[in-house]
């Protein structure tokens, strides 16, 4: 068993409160105000953010009503609290219609889901707030991209979507949007998917992500490059952005809140990373939850997908232990 597999095994069996503790730096809190405050702190440092309400899969109509209210409340808060450089908001289609995942695919009222998504996009557009359709597991990929295509054809420009490099289908999905101009986040993806539809090894996923970023840029889309991998970023910056003279207005780099990449982020932001000498927008993912259950589910998936975060969490724990428990003893040496 490799070290990363061992960490995934540990993550799969430890209780929820420990999961939340290890992943504490990666969740803004348990109310909207916590996320807004975190986004404001990033804004003061020149860092953009995207806010996400954790939780998915509406089980009944009241869940949908609540999700609509919460998304509208978040849109209102972003519009009122930020004059410039407003955070974007990530939204999940599974919160906006009751769906059931079956062997034959997703059973859902697609028209109702579309109506609810469009209502939020229209509401956000009036408030000048940008939205993103978050990507969930493979059951939701078709519906999410169908909705995004309809929104683009209707002329909405305040919406983006996500493409995952682990899925075999992604190159075909990119070709689908060749005659439209959209905003796409290119990432590996957090959901472990079956081997008949997805790559299983991270190095191959990173190779595919490089290709997908290239294809998206070539097609004229705005690309959100979502990775912490310094080597992958170096390849993208050297062989794509610099070599093809891509202006910084065509892309941005996205990372998770809490992952220790401050030096790398700083170099990218001031135009000192590799041979690309222009300042680049940096956006951090700011998730928050209204319940510990939703936070635990996200944190466990995140730790499983990125085992290195377990190491970061352990270091954070030891740092806190050193600065809270050991500090009184140092004073009396």
Where are these regions (language model features)?
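Positively charged, amphipathic and often flexible ligand-engagement surfaces
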Residues: 1-333
């Amino acid at each position: 068993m490799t070290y990363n597999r061992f960490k995934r095994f540990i993550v799969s069996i430890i209780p929820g409160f420990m999961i939340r503790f290890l992943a504490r730096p990666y969740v803004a809190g348990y109310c909207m105000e916590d996320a807004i405050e975190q986004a404001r702190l990033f804004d003061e440092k020149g860092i953009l953010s995207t806010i996400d309400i954790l939780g998915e899969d509406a089980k009944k109509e009241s869940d949908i009503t609540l999700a609509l209210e919460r998304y509208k409340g978040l849109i209102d808060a972003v519009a009122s609290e930020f004059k410039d450089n407003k955070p974007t908001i990530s939204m999940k289609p599974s919160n906006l219609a009751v769906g059931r995942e079956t062997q034959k695919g997703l059973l859902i009222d697609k028209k109702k889901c579309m109506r609810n998504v469009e209502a939020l996009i229209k509401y956000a557009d009036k408030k000048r707030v940008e939205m993103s359709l978050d990507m969930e597991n493979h059951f939701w990929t078709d519906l999410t991209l169908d909705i995004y295509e309809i929104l683009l054809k209707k002329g909405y420009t305040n919406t983006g979507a996500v493409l995952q490099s682990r899925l075999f289908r992604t190159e075909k999905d990119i070709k689908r949007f060749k005659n439209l101009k959209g905003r796409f986040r290119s990432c590996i993806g957090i959901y472990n998917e079956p081997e008949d539809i997805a790559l299983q090894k991270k190095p191959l996923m990173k190779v595919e992500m490089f290709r997908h970023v290239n294809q998206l840029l070539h097609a004229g889309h705005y690309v959100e490059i979502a990775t912490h991998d310094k080597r992958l970023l170096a390849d993208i910056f050297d062989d794509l952005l610099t070599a093809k003279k891509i202006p910084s207005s065509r892309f941005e780099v996205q990372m998770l809140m809490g992952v220790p990449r401050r030096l790398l982020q700083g170099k990218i932001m001031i135009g000192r990373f590799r041979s690309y000498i222009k300042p680049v927008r940096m956006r951090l993912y700011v998730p928050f939850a209204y319940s510990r259950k939703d936070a635990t589910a996200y944190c466990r998936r995140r730790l499983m997908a990125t085992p290195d975060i377990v190491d970061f969490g352990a270091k954070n724990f030891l740092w806190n232990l050193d600065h809270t428990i050991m500090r009184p003893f140092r004073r009396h040496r």
